[in-house]
Design a protein with these regions (language model features):
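Membrane-interface alpha helices of multi-pass inner-membrane proteins
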Residues: 172-195
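Membrane-interface helix-loop-helix junctions at transmembrane boundaries of multi-pass membrane enzymes
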Residues: 2, 8-9, 118, 206-225, ...
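Membrane-interface transmembrane helices that cradle and orient dolichyl/undecaprenyl
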Residues: 53, 156-172, 209
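Hydrophobic/aromatic-rich transmembrane helices and adjacent perimembrane loops
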Residues: 148-155, 192, 295-309, 324-375
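Signature aromatic-anchored transmembrane alpha helix within multi-pass, membrane-resident enzymes
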Residues: 12-22, 228, 232, 323, ...
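Membrane-interface micro-motifs in multi-pass membrane enzymes
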Residues: 67, 71, 117-164, 186, ...
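Transmembrane-helix motifs of polytopic, lipid-linked glycan transferases
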Residues: 94-118, 158, 310-313
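Short hydrophobic/aromatic helix or loop-helix immediately within or flanking a transmembrane segment
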Residues: 45-51, 64-87, 273-288
């Protein structure tokens, strides 16, 4: 049998090969775009966590994490990357590129669904195309920066793919429950975007079966089981995190602003901010795009946003009708996440886009699944091909921009050259310098103007004077937000006059002849 004949008889081979090639190309494109963003201490701290896991501390004993653990997706991936590449700033870019390439491919696969032939291709390319070229500034920051909700989309999309492709068997709800637990251990976003969405969609289908169709339990047991599995997964995720800590593992604090409702008086402001953040997610924001080229790209992304909105509206129209299970879950997940964002405390400019990131692939999948067929029947593939080519051009434009130097790399080199390897600094100068230096210089973050150790994305032993030492403090003159974190006058009042002081660019390095950890306030969180 010839190779072409083999492909005709086994088209899945062609699909698999195409996905592999597309994934590889997308990875290198997103790696190059990720390098245009200035790395800071947030992803650097998570890279250090993965380094500790790789070096004999898989439970991260003694670590203070953020309110998102990233323990299910990003940290394991980072461990693998660092096993191969070592502890380097490039690790963050590699992770971000791998994650986003996977999200784009999974979005395309989920949009394709069970469709075959031309319609299947149109569905996949339509959905994947909407995600294809994140905008250069905010798109890179929100989607290709490093650990920040995007990785959580992987278990969520895989769960929905399972629901889409698996037969209605008893074992599917059990696996779905495990996968939902996995996602929620990684990030609470999965509770709203996945667990609650599956529970709502399955509950609606059960009610439809009983009230509208008069079906018996023998026919609606599957959706009832999915709803129960989704609800159990919420408790299971909390139990897993608690058991990890009980076993001596990391401490993850509760969400910063809790799960309560924000005052209704601020609702108009939050709706406006949510709208701006949605534009950022889809690359259609104009506030950070000063050139004619980038403004044109923002206009182009408005087309993708319009298709996503149409897909969501089509999904809403069929939600209580004959929509399939995955479509109902996507609609429910989109509405739940948007409602949680608008009515909760997390809808802040730019950073709030992270909190609703699932809206991007969910609405793109809805566009692919619900608009792909009509567009194919209308023979609009040439128009879609032109749009896809424009998006590829936008991605190429992003990849030609200058590579950014990680923040404070000059400081890391200066400190190492002067044999200053263990000190204190503001948060934005702390873990990024540690990563910049490959771990040879360690800066522990301070808060309280320079008096208190910050218990966030750090090993508690770094600030324990019984086992660690710090003999200098770094302050900065600018930017003002960083300068206010550690104030020289407050440092002198708490730690006394330094033995000597160095000035290097915007940095002031105050060196002492004793262990500063003996005078720094050290909070006790999680028993550490």
């Amino acid at each position: 049998m010839s190779f072409s004949g083999l492909l005709r008889r086994h088209p899945r081979i062609l699909w698999a090969a195409g996905l592999a090639v597309a994934g590889l190309v997308l990875y290198f494109c997103y790696l190059r775009q990720a390098q245009t963003y200035v790395l800071n201490s947030d992803p650097a701290g998570q890279a250090l966590e993965a380094w500790a896991m790789w070096h004999g501390n898989p439970l991260l004993r003694g670590w203070w994490l953020g309110d998102i653990s990233f323990y299910g997706v990003e940290l394991p991936l980072n461990v693998i990357i660092e096993m191969v590449n070592g502890l380097r700033t490039e690790d963050v870019h590699i992770l971000a590129a791998l994650v986003y390439a996977a999200v784009v491919l999974l979005t395309a696969l989920l949009a394709r669904g069970t469709a075959r032939g031309r319609e299947g291709v149109v569905r996949a390319l339509l959905a994947g195309g909407i995600l294809l070229a994140p905008s250069l500034v905010y798109g890179t920051r929100v989607l290709i920066q490093g650990p920040n909700h995007t990785g959580t989309l992987i278990p969520i999309l895989l769960t929905l793919l399972l629901l889409d492709r698996a037969p209605e068997r008893w074992w599917v709800p059990a696996i779905v429950g495990v996968m939902l637990t996995w996602g929620q251990v990684n990030d609470p976003l999965a509770t709203f975007a996945a667990a609650a969405a599956v529970a709502v969609a399955s509950g609606v289908r059960v009610l439809q079966g009983i009230v509208r169709d008069g079906r018996t339990a023998r026919t609606w047991w599957y959706d009832a089981s999915l709803a129960v599995a989704a609800l159990i997964s919420v408790a299971a995720a909390h139990l897993v995190l608690a058991e990890i800590h009980t076993a001596g593992g990391f401490y993850a604090p509760p969400p910063k602003y809790g799960y309560g409702l924000a005052p209704l008086s601020t609702l108009p402001t939050r709706i406006h901010v949510a709208g701006s953040n949605i534009l950022m997610l889809f690359g259609a924001d104009f506030t950070s795009e000063p050139t004619a080229a980038t403004k044109a790209l923002a206009v182009l992304h408005l087309v993708g946003l319009a298709l996503a909105v149409l897909g969501l509206l089509a999904g809403l129209r069929g939600f209580l009708g004959r929509a399939d299970r995955v479509t109902q879950a996507l609609v429910a997940g989109t509405i739940i996440v948007l409602a949680a964002g608008v009515f909760g405390h997390y809808m802040l400019p730019v950073v709030g886009a992270h909190e609703i990131v699932s809206v991007l692939p969910f609405s793109a999948v809805l566009a692919g699944r619900l608009l792909g067929g009509p567009l194919t029947r209308a023979r609009l593939e040439p128009v879609l091909a032109i749009g896809l080519a424009c998006y590829l051009g936008a991605l190429a434009y992003n990849d030609t921009q200058p590579i950014a130097t990680p923040a404070h790399q000059d400081l890391a080199r200066w400190l190492e050259a002067h044999h200053l390897t263990s000190g204190l600094a503001g948060y934005w100068e702390s873990t990024i310098v540690t990563l910049d230096s490959g771990g040879r210089v360690r800066l522990v973050a301070l808060i309280g103007k320079g008096t208190t150790i910050k218990p966030y994305e750090a090993d508690s032993s770094w600030s324990n004077p019984a086992v660690s030492r710090a003999n200098f403090i770094v302050t900065v003159k600018w930017p003002l937000a960083d300068a206010h974190q550690v104030r020289p006058a407050v440092v002198r009042a708490r730690f006394g006059a330094p033995a000597r002081t160095y000035h290097f660019r915007e940095y002031r390095i105050m060196v002492y002849n004793y262990n500063l950890l003996t005078r720094a306030t050290r909070p006790s969180l999680g028993g550490y």
